[in-house]
A protein has these predicted regions:
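Recognizes the extracellular SEMA beta-propeller fold with strongest preference
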Residues: 43-167
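Small/polar beta-strand repeat architecture
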Residues: 2-57
Length: 167
């Protein structure tokens, strides 16, 4: 990992609850300097997904359809985005799920809902493919008679929370 104290960058190879190991000072052409114990320590970061506009509240779901751990994010405005274990970002590319406010993985399908344009509709993907939406391959949609506000898997059921009802 990488740490920054004032203008000096440090790299490290390991970390436990109290210690960084394998620390190298003054990396990336920075200069080693004296630091006070009150100096702010920060971690540098890398943007993983740019171009998201007007995002509102984010909702996340962790899933594994193909032996690889992934996280999917919805933000009420943009296409859902999937991050794999290498932190590479891929947008789910169908307009039927763009702007979803809630997402849940259930029985090897991804369920998307809560869009402002279709607040009563839940769209689900093909099995084992969060970005596949062919009805002939097992994808589809359902409508409930209330505005969807949350999706939650509990044991073997998908609960659909709406403004006035729970399905």
């Amino acid at each position: 990992g990488t740490l920054q104290i004032n203008s000096e960058l440090f790299t490290y190879t390991g970390i436990n609850s109290t210690t960084f190991t394998g620390v190298t000072r003054a990396t990336s052409s920075t200069t080693a300097a004296a630091h006070a114990k009150t100096d702010v320590v920060s971690e540098s970061w890398t943007a993983r997904d740019t171009g998201r506009t007007s995002a509102a509240k984010y909702h996340f779901e962790r899933f594994n359809f193909d032996g690889n751990e992934k996280i999917i994010c919805v933000d009420q405005t943009n296409y859902p985005v999937v991050f794999n274990s290498a932190m590479a970002a891929t947008d789910v590319s169908t307009s039927s799920v763009q702007g979803s406010t809630v997402v849940a993985a259930y029985r090897n399908h991804m369920f998307y809902g809560g869009k402002s344009t279709t607040p009563q509709e839940i769209v689900f993907s093909e099995p084992f493919n969060e970005d596949g939406f062919s009805s002939g391959a097992g994808a589809g949609s359902i409508k409930v008679d209330d505005t969807v506000v949350a999706l939650k898997v509990f044991r073997d059921s998908l609960f659909i929370f709406c403004e006035n009802r729970i399905f």
